[in-house]
């Protein structure tokens, strides 16, 4: 899918996901039907998602960690996809540097770090080592509720 200037402007306007397609169309000088069609296409292509986000530190009993993973083999994409489907994983990214993958993981009172390592990560073969970074305070962090 080609991302043009109109698509970028649509994405910017949808920062407020409750905004009407009509008001966006009026601002961008395009038709409401064009907005609707383009947003549908952006969603189908996994370029855009419209969802409620929250600050994990604002909800009692919730926190987030960042986990660096070193793999024993260089099957980065395959392992990234596999790990991204584990419970609590907000995102898994293939990175440069001392880790092969970096994860953002969400926890609550019923599902914590111990459960993540014993019930989820332990299922994944080919992990050489992990390092966990507990997020004490974050700025501008908003994530989807996935638990």
Model regions: which residues?
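A compositional/biophysical signature of low hydrophobicity enriched in polar/charged and small residues
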Residues: 1-147
């Amino acid at each position: 899918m080609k991302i043009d200037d109109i698509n970028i402007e649509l994405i910017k306007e949808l920062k407020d996901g409750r905004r009407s397609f009509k008001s966006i169309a009026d601002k961008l000088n395009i038709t409401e039907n064009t907005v609707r069609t383009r947003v549908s296409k952006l969603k189908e292509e996994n370029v855009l998602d419209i969802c409620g986000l929250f600050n994990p530190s604002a909800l009692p009993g919730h926190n987030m960690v960042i986990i660096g993973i070193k793999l024993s083999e260089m099957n980065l994409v395959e392992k990234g996809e596999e790990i991204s489907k584990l419970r609590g994983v907000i995102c898994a990214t293939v990175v440069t540097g001392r880790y092969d993958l970096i994860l953002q993981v969400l926890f609550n009172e019923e599902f914590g770090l111990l459960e993540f390592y014993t019930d989820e990560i332990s299922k994944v073969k080919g992990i050489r080592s992990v390092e966990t970074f507990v997020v004490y305070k974050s700025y501008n962090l908003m994530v989807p509720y996935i638990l």
